[in-house]
Regions:
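Short, intrinsically disordered, charge-balanced linker/junction segments flanking boundaries
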Residues: 188-191
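Active-site-proximal binding-pocket segments
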Residues: 183-186
Length: 191
């Protein structure tokens, strides 16, 4: 039963416990068969049981076990794209690491954890895979939020999400850059 591999990752993420080395080796070795024999709907049933605050660990475990690469290759490919960490320094990080960090911090302390919001954080930068351009020594990702919303819609349909959940997550992905635009004088006046 290859679904047990996903269940082991879920338990490890939810309870923040390490996976025994031989078990981990078996999960990695069987990762291609997990995707061959377990329907995406069954994988998503296990995924829905992951607590929102533990989802970043679950996604990282799925990536390390090479299951995410087959299930959601658009998200796994973000590990190949680099971006500047912030405008103040020249340190870089992968977009996938940035995504995991955002999931880990969503929402900040004092807010209620939201499973669909955390899923939106997983997909918020998926458009960077399709809009990335390297020019004058730096990466740009113009309109990645718009492209990402369309890509997210296709992914969520493939993963058998309900239409209401798809609409909500795509709305969050589409508008996740809104506050950056509103911080200008013109944006504040329009608001």
């Amino acid at each position: 039963n290859y679904l047990l591999a996903i269940r082991a990752l879920r338990f490890a993420a939810n309870f923040d416990i390490p996976i025994e080395p031989n078990t981990w080796l078996a999960i990695v070795r069987s990762s291609t068969r997990v995707l061959d024999y377990v329907p995406a709907a069954d994988i998503m049933d296990e995924w829905r049981k992951v607590a929102a605050e533990s989802m970043y660990r679950f996604v990282k475990l799925m990536f390390d076990a090479h299951i995410l690469q087959g299930l959601i290759p658009e998200v796994a490919a973000l590990a190949c794209i680099r971006q500047r960490r912030n405008d103040d320094d020249d340190t870089e990080e992968t977009v996938f690491d940035h995504t995991l960090e955002c999931m880990r911090h969503y929402p900040e302390e004092g807010f209620h954890y939201d499973w669909l919001g955390t899923m939106a954080m997983l997909f918020h930068d998926v458009g960077k895979l399709f809009t990335g351009e390297y020019f004058d020594g730096q990466w740009t990702f113009y309109q990645h939020h718009r492209v990402g919303a369309g890509v997210t819609r296709k992914i969520l349909r493939r993963l058998h999400f309900t239409s209401e959940d798809i609409d909500l997550i795509c709305h969050l992905v589409r508008h996740h850059m809104m506050f950056h635009f509103m911080l200008t004088d013109r944006g504040i006046r329009r608001f």
